[in-house]
Amino acid sequence: MPIKIPDDLPATSVLEAEGVMVMREADAVRQDIRPLRIGLLNLMPNKVTTETQIARLLGATPLQVELTLVRMTNHVARHTPADHMLSFYCPWEEVNDQRFDGFVITGAPVERLPFEEVTYWDEMRRVFDWTQSHVHRTLNICWAAQAAVYHFHGMKKYDLPAKASGVFRQRSLVPASPYLRGFSDDFAIPVSRWTEVRKSDIPADSGLKVLVDSTETGLCLLDDPRHRSLHMFNHVEYDTTSLADEYFRDIQVQPEAKVPVNYFPGDDAKRPPENRWRSHAHLLFGNWINEMYQSTPYDIERIGKV
């Protein structure tokens, strides 16, 4: 099934060119089914790139998805045109009376700050609490995953001695998990972060389950059944060139920045990288949506009440 997004969203032409089925508003109303309502709280600097990445993965599943783009209420995006934000994004305070089958919260370029020093931290805490009454399934990515386990479980984040940047091998630890259906035992995922949360800090009574980790970069994916959440600490959604874009940006201000590990062929930044994680990105999002579809109420107003 296709993904339903605003007709004029820049992602529309990109996804259609890739063969992703995009549904126009007029076409959607003719289908006699309830689409899954999924919100995307986009905290990344380049909103257009990130919304396209997430829409690509949501739109590849067999179910009709209606995507709502959400921003923090009072935070002003500095790297995305104001008219784009005004046209396509809703402040969280304008949607917090609505219910969603799924909600995705992205990473943010604030991970080196203590959580309490992030300007929108108070609202972020309210968002996390709101997901418990208005969202059926939540997927937190990178900084949002760190923030969620700090908010719900008191797990601290730690500075790394150097930025973890590259494509690192990961291990599937719970093959029977519905979220890992179809996963290889060993696979690669992009990592791009300055901080980490540690397996040793997981509270014994938290109910958290480590689904995926790495001997090099630690925790990758946690299942949090009590909060109906998945916490993905890495960037499975990244495009082929995302790490390259970050690297070339970084060396403009930090010439000694290291080349992302296991990314460019032969670690030669002049050679185009190859994507080795695309299939597992689609598997994760497909499995997450399937689990959501199997258990979400048909009457969306019952979300949070059953």
From Swiss-Prot:
User: What does UniProt list as catalytic?
Assistant: C142, H235, E237
| Residues noted as binding substrate in the record, renumbered to the chain | K163, S192, R249
Top EC group: transferase
**Could you tell me the EC number(s) of this protein?**
2.3.1.31
| Origin superkingdom | Bacteria
Q: Which GO terms describe its biological process?
A: L-methionine biosynthetic process from homoserine via O-succinyl-L-homoserine and cystathionine
Descriptive protein name: Homoserine O-acetyltransferase
Described function: Transfers an acetyl group from acetyl-CoA to L-homoserine, forming acetyl-L-homoserine.
